[in-house]
Amino acid sequence: MAFDYKKEYKEFYMPKAKPSIVTVPKMNYIAVRGKGNPNDENGEYKASIGLLYGIAFTIKMSYKGNHKIDGYFEYVVPPLEGFWWQDGVQGIDYSRKEEFHFISVIRLPDFVTKADFDWAVAEATRKKKTDFSLVEFFSYDEGECVQCMHIGSYDNEPATVAMMHDFAEQNGYEVDITETRYHHEIYLSDPRRCDVSKLKTVVRHPIKRKVV
């Protein structure tokens, strides 16, 4: 059985549809940075997804070639995720999608080193004849957060976010979105193949203890 991060780390990928507090450890990701409306067919966000998966599957299938990764085991590619922010906005304003900045990411298994990642970028560039220069090895220590499973349209997330913020406040926390701590979404459904009303998205916000 291939290792499935969603099943093995349910506390990060499969929270309930009610808010909870979680401490997220440092993880490494394949990442692409960009800006603009994520719904634009020819925009930077849609392009980033193809780049991420190009590297993700090059690493996943590496065991079939000459590049052997130390400690490799078969695994399911983790879900697509995104860190989002807007300049001059506290939190997220869903009515101003064209002002989004993002870091689009896919988690890397812990056994993948920076050297393995660099090999994958070179290999994917050679095989796919595509420019992967925007792809980066991104380490991020997210820390303490409030999160919730959001079911439905992305545009309806504000109701879930409000519930999360209320929960955090009731438990002695305050939201801590900053220049280095972001609105975070983990996409468990493919919007091309799933009814909008059934889309599953983990929504996560950084928090810190309230100073009394």
Language-model features, listed with the residues they occupy:
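A solvent-exposed interaction/effector surface
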Residues: M1-V212
